[in-house]
């Protein structure tokens, strides 16, 4: 149980775009109808945090702003109408479009319908690193166009053999989204899973399910040639671009066969040639978005079993020391690392 002994909490606020973060004492929010109050034991760090700090993000409309778009903790109170969760439940959540729902603070209010109820074996640190990267991979893989690649889910009838023998390419395999995309491709039965990464990360990605790891430094022409050597006459109808910059989007369109689909994690900066039948799609990985809600309810009923069974392995997590005091430095570190997630523990903040 998570009793509240104070009416205030420690939070990390961004006064304005381009400013440095500041620790402040603010009121603990209250759960409204359909919401839960969460004692926030861990918060995940993501590129969107430093991008918001540096140049802004359209979802963050109020300043001073609390950032942090994923976290995990214990339900401390439930609002009216919440029946499927109770005080003491362990959950993870995605940060929503208001200060009270973001994770760089000690207490968070979030919609109950989109909370991930955690398996007993999963730590808060691991869980806090899931909602952004894992959901981007899940939605981008399973939702039909224009929101995803439309690949069969592993919990559907024949879903694990629907793509048997087919090739798929995942650009940016060492990224957290890429690691999950590789594993989801393996669960879908793809016979050839090609990814790009630094050669030193090949063992990690092969353990997750990649059959071929190509050097990420290859030119688009060289990369396309290597993919063609591997796939032969088989069409590449699915490419997951987990990097999402203009160069990788161009590479993805060069690799994908006519009539195929490219899924990218950032808005497309390039277009498919007219008449090619190729599609370039953009994933917005939030279950609470109207276009994802029906799928989200189905997914939340099965997601934990994917980890409990060992079908999916969570990304490596590194806990940043200092609680919320460590966020500013950690966001700089985030720009230079790959293959793991950074999390902070808000209740370890010294004030």
Annotate each PLM feature.
Residues 1-21, 34, 56, 151-161, ...:
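Eukaryotic N-terminal targeting leaders
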Residues 3, 291-351:
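C-terminal hydrophobic helical "lid"/dimerization subdomain
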Residues 5, 85-86, 256:
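Short, well-ordered loop/turn sites that connect or cap secondary structure elements
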Residues 10-11, 89-90, 261:
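Residue-level marker of beta-strand positions
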Residues 27-45, 54-100, 114, 119-122:
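Glycine-rich beta-strand-centered segment in the early N-terminal region that forms part
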Residues 125-128:
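C-terminal boundary of histidine-terminating zinc-finger modules
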Residues 130-218:
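Mid-domain Rossmann-like dinucleotide-binding core that forms the NAD(H)/NADP(H) cofactor-binding site
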Residues 158-164, 212-289:
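Glycine-rich cofactor phosphate-binding loops and adjacent beta1-alpha1 units
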């Amino acid at each position: 149980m998570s009793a509240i002994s104070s009416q205030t909490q420690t939070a990390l606020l961004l006064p304005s775009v381009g400013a440095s973060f500041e620790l402040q004492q603010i009121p603990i929010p209250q759960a409204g109808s359909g919401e839960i109050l969460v004692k926030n034991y861990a918060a995940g760090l993501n590129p969107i945090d430093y991008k918001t700090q540096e140049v802004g993000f359209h979802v963050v409309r109020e300043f001073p702003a609390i950032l942090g778009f994923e976290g995990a903790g214990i339900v401390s109170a439930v609002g009216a109408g919440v029946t499927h969760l109770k005080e003491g439940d362990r959950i993870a959540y995605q940060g929503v479009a208001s200060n009270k729902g973001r994770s760089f603070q000690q207490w968070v209010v979030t919609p109950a319908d989109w909370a991930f109820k955690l398996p007993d074996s999963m730590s808060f640190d691991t869980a806090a690193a899931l909602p952004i990267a894992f959901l981007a991979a899940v939605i981008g893989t399973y939702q039909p166009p224009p929101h995803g690649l439309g690949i069969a889910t592993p919990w559907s009838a024949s879903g694990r053999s629907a793509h048997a023998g087919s090739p798929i390419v995942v650009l940016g395999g060492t990224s957290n989204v890429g690691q999950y995309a590789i594993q989801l491709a393996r669960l879908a039965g793809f016979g050839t899973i090609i990814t790009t990464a630094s050669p030193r990360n090949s063992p990690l990605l092969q353990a997750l399910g990649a059959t071929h790891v190509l050097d990420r430094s290859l030119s688009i022409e060289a990369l396309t040639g290597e993919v063609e050597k591997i796939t032969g006459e088989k069409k590449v109808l699915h490419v997951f671009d987990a990097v999402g910059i203009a160069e990788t989007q161009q590479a993805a369109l060069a690799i994908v066969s006519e009539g195929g689909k490219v899924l990218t994690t950032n808005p497309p900066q390039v277009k498919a040639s007219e008449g090619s039948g190729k599609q370039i799609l953009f994933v917005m990985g939030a279950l609470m978005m109207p276009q994802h809600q029906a799928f989200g309810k189905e997914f939340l009923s099965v997601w934990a079993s994917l980890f409990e069974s060992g079908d999916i392995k969570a990304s490596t997590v590194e806990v940043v020391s200092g609680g919320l005091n460590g966020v500013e430095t950690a966001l700089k570190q985030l720009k230079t690392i790959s293959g793991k997630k950074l999390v902070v523990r808000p209740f370890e903040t010294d004030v």
